Amino acid sequence: MLKLEMMLVVLLILPLFYFDAGGQVVQRDWRSDGLARYLQRGDRDVRECNINTPGSSWGKCCLTRMCGPMCCARSGCTCVYHWRRGHGCSCPG
């Protein structure tokens, strides 16, 4: 009977490590990397947008709800997801 009780305790406690205090699934690096790759496929990640930066003549925005109306300041930039920092622009050089 002791083995059965121990097995039940382990089965009840083990799933708790996959959730944080708020009941949300804990996000690991591999999930955010997958999201970043998803955002950068095809034309999902960028589009031409209205420029809202004074003195700038160019910008790109994310097409996803998560990025909203964010514009990158230079050409060649793409919207990427940085784990724990959220979405932002990734610009060459």
UniProtKB/Swiss-Prot annotation:
Expressed by the venom duct. Disulfide bonds join C62-C71, C67-C79, C72-C89, C77-C91. The modification 4-carboxyglutamate is found at E48. One of its GO terms (molecular function) is toxin activity. Residues 1-23 form the signal peptide. One of its GO terms (cellular component) is extracellular region. Alpha-conotoxins act on postsynaptic membranes, they bind to the nicotinic acetylcholine receptors (nAChR) and thus inhibit them. Through its two C-terminal domains, this homodimeric protein would bind to two nAChR allosteric sites, located outside the nAChR C-loop of the principal binding face and at the adjacent binding interface in a clockwise direction. This toxin specifically blocks mammalian neuronal nAChR of the alpha-7/CHRNA7, alpha-3-beta-2/CHRNA3-CHRNB2 and alpha-4-beta-2/CHRNA4-CHRNB2 subtypes. Belongs to the conotoxin D superfamily. This is Alpha-conotoxin-like Ms20.1.
